[in-house]
Amino acid sequence: MSQISAKDVKELRDTTGVGMMECKKALEETGGDMQKAVEYLRKKGAAMAAKRADREASEGVVCILMSDDQKTGVILELNCETDFVARGEVFTGFANELATLALSNNCESREDLLGIKLGEAYGNETVEEALKSMTGKVGEKLELKRMARLTAEAGVLESYIHPGSQLGALIAIDTDKPAEAKALAKDLAMQVAAAAPIEVSRDAVSTELVEKEKEIYRQQALAEGKKEEFVDKIVMGRLNKYYQEVVLTEQTFIKDQNTKVSGVLDDFMKKNQAQVKVKAFVRYQLGA
């Protein structure tokens, strides 16, 4: 067996990011052949990924990245098994690399991103392959749970990441006064993160979900002994309250409990003689 030098071990570590002892073992197993050692470590990572496939990956980070012109943004959730790994530079660096890759390749979804190739730092592997290699590197199951992309060609895009990177929101606003709307968009990104709406307006809430809620309220009212002739009115009252909880424009504004988000939008339009409309938003909370 050829002598394994510290220089070779360091070179392999710099190439793969795997620990020194694992790199030394890989070189010993492959007779000091650097390329074979890299392949050995990749296969070992894939084997570990398969072994840990049933593990629960419920920790991790939510990562957001926007283009320089702030017209396009991506948000993703990358999971691992423990908070210790989630806070490490290797994991967070990988999450940021995935966000950069998603943005530069105009990825629309997780499936799009999984097939894109990373650079030399990650062995020119696809994201799907790199997730397995990174499992071998950090010793935990890694999973790209979800990813989304928003654009705001006719307006402004803003984001909010809560400290700890476990909650984030991305929002797109259509407006003819984008510069003036920056602060508004930031406030609304925080609103989405804090209040967890599911749609921009009540018209966007699915009929299936509305009917499900109405049936729940109907059964509740009957169980409470309410008279049949009053049940429909009670159901509509509770449904309106539900809309106020889950529809962005009908929520109470987090910075002023006496104002609805719709009122904030109206005030902005009057003050700035501008048009403004929430186009879309995405909210990711770790594990949710």
From Swiss-Prot:
The keyword Cytoplasm applies. It is found in: Cytoplasm. Keywords: Cytoplasm, Elongation factor, Protein biosynthesis. PROSITE patterns: EF_TS_1, EF_TS_2. GO terms for cellular component: cytoplasm. The keyword rRNA-binding does not apply. InterPro entries: EF-Ts_dimer_sf, Transl_elong_EFTs/EF1B, Transl_elong_EFTs/EF1B_dimer, Transl_elong_Ts_CS, UBA-like_sf. One of its GO terms (molecular function) is translation elongation factor activity. This is Elongation factor Ts. It comes from Chlorobaculum tepidum (strain ATCC 49652 / DSM 12025 / NBRC 103806 / TLS).
